[in-house]
C-alpha cells in the first residue's frame, strides 16, 4: 500500500506550528510517512477569514499560553512564548519557499523556529 501524503501547513509565527514541527521527524521515523512542509502566511489567512488571531484575543490568549506550556512540558520541548508576539514573518516565510527549492530547507526552518520559540527573538 502506498504511503499517504501528509501536508503540514505552517508559519514560523505560530507556536503550534513550532511544537508540531518538533515532533514530525519522530513521527516520520515511527511510521515511514513523509511529511510535506507547506509554508503559509498565517496573518494573511486571518485577514482573509476576517478573524483575530487566537493569541491576540485576551481570553483565548491566556488559554493558549497555558496549553502551549502543557504540550511543551509533556513532550520535553524547549519552548518559551515569544515576548514580541505577534511576530511578523512574511519575509521569513517567503525565504522558506525559496529554501524549499534548495537543500537547506530543514536547516532554515529549524533555525527560525528556534529563534522564535526558544530564544524569543523577533
Q: Model-flagged regions — what are they?
A:
Residues 12, 18-119:
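Structural alpha/beta surface segment adjacent to cysteine/selenocysteine redox centers
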Amino acid at each position: 500500500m502506498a504511503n499517504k501524503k501528509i501536508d503540514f501547513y505552517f508559519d514560523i509565527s505560530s507556536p503550534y506550528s513550532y511544537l508540531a514541527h518538533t515532533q514530525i521527524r519522530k513521527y516520520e521515523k515511527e511510521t515511514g510517512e513523509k511529511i510535506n512542509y507547506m509554508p503559509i502566511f498565517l496573518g494573511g489567512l486571518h485577514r482573509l477569514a476576517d478573524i483575530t488571531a487566537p493569541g491576540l484575543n485576551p481570553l483565548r490568549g491566556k488559554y493558549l499560553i497555558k496549553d502551549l506550556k502543557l504540550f511543551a512540558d509533556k513532550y520535553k520541548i524547549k519552548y518559551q512564548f515569544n515576548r514580541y508576539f505577534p511576530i511578523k514573518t512574511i519575509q521569513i516565510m517567503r525565504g522558506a519557499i525559496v529554501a524549499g527549492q534548495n537543500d537547506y530547507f530543514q536547516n532554515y526552518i529549524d533555525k527560525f523556529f528556534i529563534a522564535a520559540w526558544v530564544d524569543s527573538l523577533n
